[in-house]
Amino acid sequence: MQAAAEPAKSAAKKGTTIKVERTKFGKALVNRAGRAVYLFDIEEGPTSECYDECARAWPPVLTKGKPLAGKGVSKGKLGTTTRRDGRRQVTYAGHPLYFYVHDTPDEILCQDVVEFGGRWLLVRPNGTALR
């Protein structure tokens, strides 16, 4: 019984994979499942400004381990920041990363949307906002 619990425990410590895929907006960062990730343009540096209602609409991309660089992603640009609740949020080129709550791997709904005092944009492989 203990052996069965061990793989699940070690899988939980794995880092979140970020990779590049071609979207209808151009090449952009996505997670392993193909779900788009965004940056929030009012954030300067790795500290998240999106909490409470904002984080319910734009959940942070979290990781339990070191984030993993998938296809097209620069390993050196991946990092983490610690949120107020102690969870680790994935960053890329210094930008905290987020999902949009209603996106799916097949559908990007909120590219270049203004909400919560800033603009939400997909992230290019070089770490800049896709405009």
Regions found by a protein language model. Give the residues of each.
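Compact beta-sheet-dominated domain cores in extracellular/mature segments
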Residues: 1-131
